């Protein structure tokens, strides 16, 4: 990105690094990457267009549980919210897969994903950006991780819900 800026002759004087909503980290087993940037851009254009085809209530419709998860488990994003321009935009990394067993559908940190890539054969990571301030949320990326070795799901461990009903 810096090279593009240098070629065009427009160098940024900002102290912040170049902004990109992507959280694509170069992990050794990352494959089948799907970037939802075009869909995101289309939604934002529909929201900002003079004869709006998308109302703000429809675009900023984050579920209260998603906002709560973003406040407590989100990793700070390097971009501002595209709707309200808040700096509170965070990314959530959801993991899904048969080999994860009862751990499928949980939120994991980026460092945990690197460890999981060595533990599990294959699982899908879905990255969602969420703004707790205005409720904007959008899936920005999905990809597969894992070492490719087929494994059984881990044994189901008893949870608090199992004990107390």
What are these regions (language model features)?
Residues 1-25:
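N-terminal amphipathic/basic-hydrophobic helices that include classical n-h-c signal peptides
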Residues 24-64:
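N-terminal alpha-helical interaction blocks
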Residues 28-34, 141-165:
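C-terminal/domain-terminus segments
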Residues 56-71, 109-117:
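Short Cys/His-rich Zn2+-coordinating modules
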Residues 74-78, 124-130:
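Short metal-coordination and nucleic-acid-contact micro-motifs, chiefly zinc-binding Cys/His arrays
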Residues 78-79, 85-121:
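Short recognition patches in nucleic-acid-associated and regulatory proteins
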Residues 81-84, 131-134:
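Short cysteine-rich clusters marking metal-coordination/redox-active sites
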Residues 87-91, 137-143:
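Short, non-ligating residues that shape and space the ligands of small metal-coordination modules
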């Amino acid at each position: 990105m810096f090279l593009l800026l240098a070629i065009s002759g427009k160098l940024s004087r900002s102290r912040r690094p170049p902004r990109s909503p992507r959280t694509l980290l170069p992990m050794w087993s990352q494959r089948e990457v799907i970037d939802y940037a075009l869909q995101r851009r289309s939604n934002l254009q529909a929201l900002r267009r003079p004869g709006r085809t998308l109302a703000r209530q429809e675009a900023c419709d984050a579920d209260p549980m998603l906002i709560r998860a973003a406040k407590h488990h989100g990793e700070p994003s390097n971009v501002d919210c595209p709707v309200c321009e808040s700096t509170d935009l965070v990314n959530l990394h959801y993991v899904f897969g048969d080999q994860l067993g009862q751990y499928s559908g949980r939120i994991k940190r980026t460092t945990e994903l690197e460890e999981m890539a060595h533990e599990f054969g294959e699982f899908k990571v879905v990255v969602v950006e969420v703004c707790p301030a205005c409720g904007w949320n959008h899936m920005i990326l999905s990809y597969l991780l894992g070492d490719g070795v087929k494994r059984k799901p881990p044994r189901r461990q008893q949870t608090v819900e199992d004990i107390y009903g």
